[in-house]
């Protein structure tokens, strides 16, 4: 599973949420990003252990254009089997593309796919990942991309028992020491 460079909450949540879904289904799956994953998203990948296997499918999540993969993953761009995205600007570079431009986040598209195809029952960690992506890409549900479907997906994810208030505070209210220092100057 490939995510975009300069990772945000949606690409990290999509990548790890989908990875955990596939693993729960008995599939081998790993997440790759050209850039280091920000520590603020560590709660989504702290227990993640990469698996050793040769992939037969490559999925890109929240990657509208292969240029967004970054230099470390650019070599895989022409081999992407499936792209799951929500950007109307998607350039359809994958063999198959699932784009829902009315969705607030790729995580919303993935959750809809999980439900509609009855892939597996999400657990608390999967729900945490998917909710985080929806929350961050919707600006904590205040951006115009937020729809009734966005709220319904978030509500269904909340049923899995994670702490949404903590996630929203961490994503929108907490500042790193380095950011505080920059703002003080």
Region locations from a protein language model:
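Hydrophobic/aromatic residues located in beta-strands of well-ordered beta-sheets
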Residues: 29-31, 81, 130
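Glycine-rich, phosphate-binding/catalytic loops in enzymes
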Residues: 18-19, 75-78, 99-100, 152
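Short alpha-helices
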Residues: 87-153
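Fold-independent oxyanion-binding glycine-rich loops
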Residues: 4-5, 34-35, 61-64, 84-87, ...
């Amino acid at each position: 599973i490939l995510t975009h460079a300069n990772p945000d909450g949606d690409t990290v949540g999509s990548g790890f949420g989908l990875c955990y879904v596939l693993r729960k289904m008995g599939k081998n799956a790993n997440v790759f990003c050209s850039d280091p994953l920000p520590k603020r998203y560590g709660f989504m990948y702290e227990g993640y252990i990469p698996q050793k296997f040769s992939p037969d499918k490559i999925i890109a999540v929240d990657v509208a254009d292969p240029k967004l993969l970054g230099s470390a993953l650019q070599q895989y761009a022409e081999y992407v089997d499936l792209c799951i995205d929500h950007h109307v600007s998607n350039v359809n570079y994958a063999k198959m593309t699932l784009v829902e431009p009315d969705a607030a986040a790729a995580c919303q598209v993935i959750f809809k796919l999980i439900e509609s195809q009855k892939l597996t029952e999400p657990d608390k960690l999967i729900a945490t990942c998917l909710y985080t992506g929806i929350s961050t890409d919707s600006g904590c549900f205040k951006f115009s991309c937020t729809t009734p479907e966005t709220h319904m997906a978030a509500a269904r994810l909340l049923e899995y028992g994670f702490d949404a208030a903590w996630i929203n505070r961490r994503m929108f209210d907490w500042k790193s020491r380095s950011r505080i220092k920059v703002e003080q100057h």
